Amino acid sequence: GFGSLFKFLAKKVAKTVAKQAAKQGAKYVANKHME
């Protein structure tokens, strides 16, 4: 049904957002160490 599709999409988006956040966090930490 529609509910399961929504759940699936929400999971996918959450995974992508987490990946992007991890990338940004790593960049931020690296920049802080460079200073």
Swiss-Prot record:
Top-rank taxon, per record: Eukaryota
BP terms from Gene Ontology: defense response to bacterium; killing of cells of another organism
Tissues/organs with expression: Expressed by the venom gland.
Keyword list, A-Z: Amidation, Antibiotic, Antimicrobial, Cytolysis, Hemolysis, Neurotoxin, Secreted, Toxin
GO molecular function: toxin activity
Signal peptide, first to last residue: none
Glutamic acid 1-amide found at: E35
Places the protein is found: Secreted
One GO CC annotation: extracellular region
Chief place of localization: secreted
Assigned protein family: Belongs to the cationic peptide 04 (cupiennin) family. 01 subfamily.
Biological role stated in the UniProt entry: Has antimicrobial activity against B.subtilis, E.coli, E.faecalis, P.aeruginosa, and S.aureus. Has insecticidal and hemolytic activities. Probably acts by disturbing membrane function with its amphipathic structure.
Identification of the protein by name: Cupiennin-1d
Record organism: Cupiennius salei
